[in-house]
Amino acid sequence: MPIRRQLATSVKPEVLLVAPIYKPAQAKLEATYTTHSLLNASDRTALISEVAPRIDVVVTSGGGAGIKRALMEQLPKLKLIACFSVGLDSVDLAAARELGIAVTNTPDVLTDEVADLAIGLMLATSRRIAAADRFVRAGQWLDGGFALTAKVSGKRLGIVGMGRIGQAIARRAAAFDMQIA
């Protein structure tokens, strides 16, 4: 019995970009898929109306536009919402679940970077590093010393939320003998 082959199609899945994402990632999306962007659309409503019947995927970022039920319901072919972020708080997850739309994110992608920055900002604030830098650059050190600053070692650190990032911050704070509250 002969094997029937499905004809290859040149039709690319269509993607709606609703928030800015990392430029190299956007370039790959545009090379692989037919991409429509709301970012610079002069008439967002008209663009959505025009492309809605063909959109398979919506792509967004954590700091970007939210994906609400109303938009999902306008896109009858929508199968996936891809979030280039750790959090999903900008997506109506209940609506996506109810409408059978998969939602993805990028957990752990920036956990270490965010934790490192949090510790760096804590040190910069408590030790007044930016102010001390300005003091030295302005030549004020010739007139006297910069005021003493506070140490962080042995202090108590309050962390709101002990998810991946909170735990990574706590591990780093342990190196400063900090108590976690």
Q: Where are the predicted features?
A:
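N-terminal glycine-/charge-rich "phosphate-binding" loop or analogous flexible N-terminal tail
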Residues: 1-62
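A short, basic/flexible loop-to-alpha-helix module at the beginning of a structural domain
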Residues: 3-5, 139-150
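Short secondary-structure boundary/capping segments
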Residues: 6-8, 26-27, 49, 94-95, ...
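Rossmann-like dinucleotide/phosphate-binding beta-alpha-beta segment
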Residues: 10-11, 31, 146-181
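Structural detector of well-ordered beta-strand residues that form the stable sheet scaffold
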Residues: 16, 80-82, 102-104, 158, ...
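Rossmann-fold NAD(P)-dependent oxidoreductase module
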Residues: 28, 117, 121, 168, ...
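Conserved beta-strand segments of alpha/beta enzyme cores
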Residues: 34-36, 102, 179
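Phosphate/diphosphate ligand-binding glycine-rich loop within oxidoreductases
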Residues: 56-137, 147-149, 153
